[in-house]
């Protein structure tokens, strides 16, 4: 799970820096830094001990939950009950995908 969180922070953080530069008129240096961080996002999931499809499917759930949290903590947009419920549902899906017993 640590690698999923790290990948999520790279993807969301890098994307956010690009967003700030292109949508909010901040320095283009932020976009450049964001692109580098997005490149790290592409590498981090390779550290997962499972195959590509499972790793990215599970990561998608972590991304959703982290995005809600990022919006709350960074953008100061308080999630409503449906945002929170959806975040918990996708995290439950992550646990099923990654840790369900397989034979």
Swiss-Prot record:
Chain segments annotated as transmembrane: 2-22, 27-47, 55-75, 81-101
Main location: membrane
One GO CC term, this protein: plasma membrane
Membrane association type: Multi-pass membrane protein
Keyword line: Cell inner membrane, Cell membrane, Membrane, Transmembrane, Transmembrane helix
Subcellular location: Cell inner membrane
InterPro entries cross-referenced by the UniProt entry: UPF0060
UniProt xrefs under NCBIfam families: PRK02237.1 (NF002586)
Protein family membership: Belongs to the UPF0060 family.
Protein name, as recorded: UPF0060 membrane protein Ava_2216
């Amino acid at each position: 799970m640590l690698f999923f969180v790290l990948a999520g922070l790279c993807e969301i953080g890098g994307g956010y820096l690009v967003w700030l530069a292109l949508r909010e008129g901040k320095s283009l240096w932020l976009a450049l830094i964001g692109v580098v961080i997005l490149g790290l996002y592409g590498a981090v999931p390779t550290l997962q001990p499972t195959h590509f499809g499972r790793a990215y499917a599970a990561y998608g759930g972590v991304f959703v939950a982290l995005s809600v949290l990022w919006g709350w903590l960074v953008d100061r947009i308080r999630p409503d009950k449906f945002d929170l419920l959806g975040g918990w549902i996708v995290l439950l899906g992550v646990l099923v995908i990654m840790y369900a017993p397989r034979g």
